[in-house]
Amino acid sequence: MRSRPTDHARRAIGFGWLVLATVALIVPGAGARQARHYALESVEGLRLHNVTAQPATLQGKKGLRVTISDEAFRRLQGMTPAEQAQVQQLALIEGVDFTNGVIQAEIAGVPAPGAPEGARGFVGIAFRLQSDLKTYDAFYLRPTNGRADDQERRNHAAQYISHPDWPWSRLRQETPSRYEAYVDLVPDVWTKIKIDVRADHARLYVHDQEQPTLVVNDVKTGAQGRGAVALWLDRGTVAHFRNLTVEPSTAK
């Protein structure tokens, strides 16, 4: 005859199940890695490339104000438009190796004083950035397009690019509307964005929306692409960034 467990044994078994349940709650899901948060209230931890950055307050929230550097601006003056397009303005987040995962931030952009007529306040996030600081994927916004009277401009409010081979101009010419989308935007106003990357699929979410603003099913760096994360802006933009979170994942 099998003996019945004592009260002490039953309590021990119950405690064991409690421990297992607690561990299940606190251990991250398969493939998850530690999320890294950057307040972006200083330039600490950033590598500046053709930009200047300084702490600033916008709409009562602290962040970084980022613009093209004076030196880079002077160099652009002697270049052709094609050459200018190859000059990138980036603030690299040091120590990040990103393949798949989620990137979130609050960003704002407005055309800089004296910017060309075509300036839109371009501002965004680059990912899988290579050491040459020229090869990367990115999602960015055109804030002045968000409420433009021209519907075509509205349709170009959000953009995916992959430099150097797939700039916005080539993507728009060869596959109109596939890598651009409408989203309501206001210049120089904090805008929450989330970029979710899985292999060669990426989605851009704006304003905490449950559904993506822009879906890309053929990320140009491919399923195995990897590299750094950087704050991204166009040379004619006054950009602000704050509250950046990078959460890499091994899941595909």
Locate the predicted segments by residue.
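N-terminal secretory signal peptides that target proteins for export/translocation
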Residues: 1-11
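Residues at secondary-structure transition points
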Residues: 8-10, 20-22, 130, 233
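N-terminal compositionally biased or targeting/leader segments
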Residues: 12-13, 175
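Bacterial N-terminal signal peptides
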Residues: 14-26
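Sec/Tat signal peptide C-region and signal peptidase I cleavage site
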Residues: 29-31
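Extracellular glycan-recognition regions
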Residues: 33-252
